[in-house]
Design a protein with these regions (language model features):
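Non-catalytic accessory segments adjacent to catalytic cores
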Residues: 111-155
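Short intrinsically disordered coil segments
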Residues: 97, 169-178, 332-339
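The substrate-binding groove and active-site-proximal loops of carbohydrate-active enzymes
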Residues: 102-108
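N-terminal cap/recognition module
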Residues: 95-102
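Aromatic (often tryptophan-rich) hydrophobic motifs at membrane interfaces
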Residues: 68-80, 87-89, 100, 112-123, ...
Length: 365
């Protein structure tokens, strides 16, 4: 007995084993499960840090990705997904992450952050990109003059209640009347097991806006890759005409309506307002307490629509580090140099726009 006690006392008295070094790695297929376990546990991480985005982006758009992680003593301490966009028309960039509204480093300590930042910097130089972009929800390098920000995007996030009546009453009067109009007209929401109707409504909407459409296989891959965390919800009239549809992500206690669109009849039946209300109801019933209305550009109709729903805009301080470029990127529909293209695109027949769009949009990110 004395020997057991002495051994235990000696173990307690022994100095703690020093932590091992931080090491940088590229994610391999067998790392995906523990990568995602880290992302789900890390407060800094978002849905857009999940490993599934690598397959979705590479297979949908044919662009190259680098999913870096830092490990210490066999445990992941930080992650940084990156992807390269290379286009004669829109420039050459490395970003975290293209096609995602949030991104950048998600880590538990400063050593991991520094290693991941350094990896991105070295890769950007190696590739010869014009700029590196981090799409963070907060500035990661506020005191580093080599990183720049620009005021272009905002996000709209708001707490929701478990009570439908409370959520309805929180919507400002004018938009609440639109929701009630949709209810009175008998609109209904249906969860789809494929992306067919969603793509139909989405393609119809983006053509009206004059912007290229994503390939249909992109949405199908999102649904297949993220399973129950990716929902397609369509709105129909009482006689089953398609009105609108939205593809949303579920993440922790949040719902993120990400891609959506409406048919021509949507405006007359308040289809878009009803769609987001129907989604809010379903999300609240599922236990969500945050409704993330998503990113919008300042000065756009989408920005005004979300403001009219009572959501407050929060700036997204995306960060840019310049390499071969001498100016911050300006690849967005508000840029005057794209206005002629947008006017011409709106006049295309829908099948032509759906054929040409994916070849252009893969270079936008």
């Amino acid at each position: 007995m004395n020997s057991i006690i002495e051994a235990a006392q000696a173990k307690r008295a022994a100095p703690a084993q020093a932590a091992g070094p931080h090491t940088l790695h590229l994610m391999q297929p067998h790392d995906a499960a523990r990568w995602d376990a880290f992302v789900r546990a890390c407060p800094d991480a978002t849905f857009f840090h999940l490993s599934g985005w690598q397959k979705v982006i590479e297979q949908s758009f044919g662009i190259k990705t680098w999913f870096y992680y830092v490990e210490q003593d066999g445990q992941i301490q930080g992650v940084l997904p990156l992807a390269e966009i290379k286009s004669r028309l829109f420039g050459h960039s490395l970003g975290a992450m293209p096609f995602c509204v949030y991104g950048g480093v998600a880590a538990t300590d400063e050593k991991s952050r520094a290693l991941l930042d350094d990896a991105a910097d070295k890769l950007a130089k190696q590739l010869g990109v014009g700029h590196l972009e981090y799409r963070g929800m907060q500035r990661a390098h506020p005191d580093d003059p080599s990183w720049h920000t620009k005021e272009l995007y905002v996000t709209f996030r708001k707490e929701i209640s478990s009570d439908d009546e409370a959520n309805l009453n929180a919507i400002p009067r004018k938009q609440r009347a639109m929701v009630r109009k949709g209810i009175k007209l008998g609109l209904k929401g249906v969860v789809e097991d494929n992306v067919d109707r969603m793509f139909e409504a989405y393609a119809n909407s983006v053509l009206r806006l004059g912007t290229p459409v994503f390939p249909k296989k992109y949405f199908a891959l999102l649904q297949k890759t993220f399973g129950d965390e990716c929902e397609v919800r369509s709105i129909y009239t009482a006689d089953d005409q398609l009105v609108a549809s939205v593809l949303s992500f579920y993440w922790r206690d949040e719902v993120v309506p990400y891609y959506g669109g409406g048919m021509d009849l949507a405006r007359g039946v308040a289809g878009n307002d009803f769609m987001y209300w129907n989604l809010m109801q379903a999300a609240a019933a599922r236990g969500c307490r945050i409704f993330d209305y998503g990113r919008s550009k300042l000065g756009t109709g989408a920005y005004d629509f979300k403001k009219n729903w009572g959501f407050e805009a929060t700036p997204l301080p995306y960060e840019y580090k310049l390499y071969a470029s001498t100016a911050l990127p300006d690849n967005n529909p508000l840029n005057p140099k794209y206005q002629l293209f947008i006017k011409m695109w709106k006049k295309l027949p829908l099948p032509v726009a759906n054929f040409l769009g994916p070849h252009i949009v893969r270079n936008l990110g």
